[in-house]
Amino acid sequence: MQSLSLRAHAKVNMHLWVGARRADGLHSIESVMQRITLADSLSLSRLDIPGRCEVCSPYMALPRENTLTRAYARFCQVTGVHDGVRVRVVKRIPAGSGLGGGSADAAALLCGLDTLFGTTLSARVLREVAYSVGSDVPFFLASQAACVLGGGEQLVPLVPKTGYLGLLVWPGLHSGSAQAYEDLDRLRACGVHAADGEQYSLRGATALSAHYAQDCARWRFFNSLDAPVQRRYPVVALARWDLARAGACFTAMSGSGSXVFGLYRDEEELRRAHKLLAKRWCWCVRVRLCG
């Protein structure tokens, strides 16, 4: 095989509890993630330069070292493959939005490299390689919806919610995950309760799965990073408030932000909300939940 094309779907966090920083520098998390129809497009082709991963992104500049180059390097280390590859990425998922664009791209590339070079890695090895690239990457290998636990390496599949439509609002801010977690640690060190929702006992995959199965209007999900991100970027709270006022039955910030999303029950509700919010926000996109 000389080339292939792939899609890398974004995700939203319905829920994100963040625990203390671990010895390895990561924080323990308990999250409910679901993939959505917003996606980047990747085209892979063989390159006659051994050990080279050439990344081209026509609409968004990428740093020289990124999740794609890291994924390629780790793939080569594990498989012994040294053939070069050219990757063309059409970015639709905003960077710094909490929608997992970089991780989704890395997961798609790993699957694509495995196919392109015929290495037939086992699911376990592929997950291990993915986790070494980034804590969110394993989720994007196969899951449509899952409880994500530990440092991101533990996945408990969920039956995807497909009965809702989504509206994304991105305020145009790059919210770095490292900064968000550092801000959360500082708030906690000062004794600030970081998320009102943390009073609820939504802990563990069993409790999260049962809660996720309910109607979204009954969800008590929360995001531990709400307080630190919204203190730094108040416009994120405004965007979420706008979604609620536009009739969303559930709203949340995804990951470490800065994108927020709302869930709607039918096309007409979604159409009205999109028409209203597109006048206020330059990036406002309708999506479906993948199932």
Curated annotation (Swiss-Prot):
Active site feature: K11, D136
Chain residues that bind ATP: P94, A95, G96, S97, G98, L99, G100, G101, G102, S103, A104
EC numbers: 2.7.1.148
Domain of life: Bacteria
Record key words, sorted: ATP-binding, Isoprene biosynthesis, Kinase, Nucleotide-binding, Transferase
Entry keyword annotation includes Transferase: yes
Gene Ontology molecular function: 4-(cytidine 5'-diphospho)-2-C-methyl-D-erythritol kinase activity; ATP binding
Coiled coil residues, start to end: none
Annotated NCBIfam families: ispE
HAMAP family xref list: IspE
Protein name: 4-diphosphocytidyl-2-C-methyl-D-erythritol kinase
Encoding gene, per UniProt annotation: ispE
